[in-house]
């Protein structure tokens, strides 16, 4: 799995059927690759929820999303696995097929919820308008393979 984590002051996702938004927290762009498994879901969810990327009273990155009362906006993003080696049009054969990817994306969101953080989501497999107000900016890419962070 590949997940782009952005610390935000606010973020929202909208399409014809949904509108979800959060205030302070994390916006996650979640990519599910061909080799992604349930072990990756658990490993990366734990790592992200516990990531100390919010400032404490001394300005040091020392607090996680729960400690600041933040929420998570999780958005599926198959384009994170784009192959751009040949030509000018990206290929997406490195992304897991939609049905399997959606299953792991949903499992990932459930894993985040198990840590007691509020999680809102986009709608899998649809075009969406994503509005992100980065805070910092703090942007970190997490990758997991075979249940280990790489």
Swiss-Prot record:
PANTHER family: D-AMINOACYL-TRNA DEACYLASE 1, D-TYROSYL-TRNA TYR DEACYLASE. GO terms for cellular component: cytoplasm. GO terms for biological process: D-amino acid catabolic process. A Gly-cisPro motif from one monomer fits into the active site of the other monomer to allow specific chiral rejection of L-amino acids. This is D-aminoacyl-tRNA deacylase. It is found in: Cytoplasm. Its EC number is 3.1.1.96. It comes from Staphylococcus carnosus (strain TM300). The keyword tRNA-binding applies. Its main location: cytoplasm. It comes from the Bacteria. HAMAP family: Deacylase_Dtd. The lineage of its organism: Bacteria, Bacillati, Bacillota, Bacilli, Bacillales. Homodimer. It catalyses: glycyl-tRNA(Ala) + H2O = tRNA(Ala) + glycine + H(+); a D-aminoacyl-tRNA + H2O = a tRNA + a D-alpha-amino acid + H(+).
């Amino acid at each position: 799995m590949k997940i782009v984590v952005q610390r935000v002051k606010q973020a929202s996702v909208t399409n014809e059927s949904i509108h979800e938004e959060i205030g302070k927290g994390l916006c996650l762009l979640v990519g599910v690759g061909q080799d992604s498994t349930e072990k990756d879901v658990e490993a990366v969810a734990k790592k992200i929820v516990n990531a100390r990327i919010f400032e404490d009273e001394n300005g040091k990155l020392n607090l996680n999303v729960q400690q600041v009362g933040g929420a998570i906006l999780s958005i599926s993003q198959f384009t994170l696995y784009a192959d751009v080696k040949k030509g000018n049009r990206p290929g997406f054969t490195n992304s897991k097929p939609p049905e399997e990817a959606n299953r792991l994306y949903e499992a990932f969101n459930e894993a985040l919820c198990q840590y007691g953080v509020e999680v809102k989501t986009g709608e899998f497999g649809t075009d969406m308008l994503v509005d992100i107000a980065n805070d910092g900016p703090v942007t970190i890419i997490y990758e997991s393979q075979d249940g280990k962070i790489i």
